[in-house]
Regions:
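Structural signature of alpha-solenoid helical repeat junctions
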Residues: 73-80, 133, 157-160, 164
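Hydrophobic-face positions in mid-chain alpha helices that act as interaction patches
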Residues: 180, 186-244
Length: 244
């Protein structure tokens, strides 16, 4: 999701007029830490987020269930398996943070249902605990790391819209950070910084340009790209609805 609640924001000098002052007022909620950030009466998108992630988890589960039944080299299957495990961990990480509590607040609190196969079973009648969801995330990332190790360095850093090893390491660092495992967070963040040659995107001189498009593969910070512009803005549209 879009990182709105931080101080990494700079406004251009260009005057911007919008046809609706209400639109501007609603967006102020996102950038002012307003307690009414979410107006649940209009939060139909929350159910869409839930179903969207579980649809993608179904895709990852299907890959893992049937991968051995298809042809392919050891390296090709390892690549696909590594991507599926990383993506499933990514989806569950987002789900448990959206619909569960903070990891170190109450590990026994309700998290989200863990669906680990593509079988057509209910599986949604019980929510796993926050601790159980994080345990599964770490297990999936362990499996992903093992499978990435089979690949060449070039294959590990495949660019474009396929998950890669540095993206998995970045996700692992973020998971560790949410668990307040600072040693693990630093370990995997350092791997991303030291091992892959990514550079910071130079935005100096762009402050006068409205709507700088930094979400491109040409951005030297880009590790992995996915989704569409709608995915970036959908949570803003949901979050910025203002109460009457």
């Amino acid at each position: 999701f879009h990182n709105a609640l931080d101080d990494d924001i700079e406004m251009s000098d260009e005057e911007l007029f919008h046809q609706s002052s209400a639109f501007i007022e609603t967006l102020q909620l996102v950038y002012s830490w307003n307690p009414e950030l979410f107006e649940l009466s209009r939060a139909g998108s929350l159910s869409q987020i839930w179903s969207m992630y579980y649809q993608r988890i179904l895709g990852a589960n299907s890959v893992l269930d049937y991968l051995e039944d298809v042809s392919g080299t050891v390296e090709e299957k390892a690549s696909v398996r590594a991507q599926a495990y990383t993506l499933r961990a990514f989806y569950y990480f987002n789900l448990v943070n959206l619909f569960g509590g903070p990891y170190n607040h109450d590990k026994s609190a309700a998290g989200v249902p863990l669906k680990l196969t593509s079988d057509l079973t209910d599986g949604f009648d019980t929510r796993a605990t926050v601790s159980e969801v994080y345990d599964r995330i770490l297990k999936d990332l362990d499996e992903a790391e093992k499978n990435f190790a089979v690949l060449s360095e070039k294959q590990q850093k495949s660019m474009g819209y396929r998950i890669n090893l540095p993206a998995m390491q970045l996700l692992r660092a973020r998971v560790c950070l949410h668990m307040e495992n600072m040693e693990g967070a630093a370990k995997y963040a350092r791997k991303v910084i030291d091992d892959w040659g990514y550079e910071l995107y130079d935005m100096s001189g762009k402050v006068d340009t409205l709507y700088v498009n930094y979400m491109t593969l040409d951005n030297p910070e880009t590790i992995w790209m996915y989704g569409s512009p709608d995915d970036v803005t959908s949570m803003l549209a949901l979050s910025a609805t203002m109460n009457d």
